[in-house]
A protein has these predicted regions:
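C-terminal accessory regions
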Residues: 30, 86-194
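Conserved helicase motor core of P-loop NTPases
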Residues: 1-83, 89-91
Length: 194
């Protein structure tokens, strides 16, 4: 499955002239869905960062030099709050000293962190979920909708689309995309009628 998806994404990359800075979004983190965050990140890492050597796989994660990463938890330890969802790029992984040097994208601030902590607090970030992308924007957004994913609501699709500054590309069947556009979150009111 991963090899098939990698080849598929390579074709999309060539067709639309996509770059490493493009953002790939999907709704699912669950591995049972065809397009999920882990599978997309593994495939996109092979495409956009193929030349860097693999490092030790820790916690089922395989970071490389020059990878895109994203915080998966808040950090208040150094007096400067770092939020879940902040993006970074890895400058280097030093196996001898077990250190990762990286730079936060939003402020270009460089930091070092022990490898174990980095692997616990960061994930690959070539792809993320619709919800993790809230508040950010990229020139090119590629939205993957897994086949028969009928539970995605139109407000989630709108959230994903609104992240695009220039182009929004959907990877879906027409039927699945249409089902998502027609479904809406129920409006829940706490107003009591008398």
């Amino acid at each position: 499955k991963e090899k098939e998806i990698t080849e598929f994404i390579k074709n999309i990359k060539e067709k639309y002239k996509l770059e490493k800075k493009s953002k790939f979004l999907c709704y699912n983190t669950n591995k049972k869905y065809y397009f999920n965050v882990d599978i997309l990140n593994n495939c996109l890492q092979k495409i956009f960062n193929p030349d860097e050597k693999d490092n030790d796989k820790i916690y089922q994660k395989n970071f490389k030099n020059k990878d895109k990463a994203i915080r998966n938890k808040n950090d208040y330890s150094d007096g400067k709050m770092r939020a879940n969802g902040e993006e970074a790029e890895i400058d280097s992984i030093n196996d001898s000293y077990h250190l990762v040097r990286f730079k936060y994208i939003n402020d270009n601030e460089e930091e070092s962190m022990d490898k174990k902590t980095f692997y616990e607090e960061f994930d690959l970030n070539y792809a993320c979920t619709f919800h993790k992308s809230q508040g950010d924007g990229w020139d090119d957004i590629i939205i993957f909708i897994s086949p028969n994913t009928t539970f995605i609501k139109k407000n989630a699709i709108y959230t994903a689309m609104s992240r695009a500054k220039k182009r929004c590309i959907f990877i879906s069947t027409k039927e699945d995309l249409k089902k998502c556009q027609l479904s809406a979150e129920p409006i829940i009111s706490t107003f009591l009628e008398h």
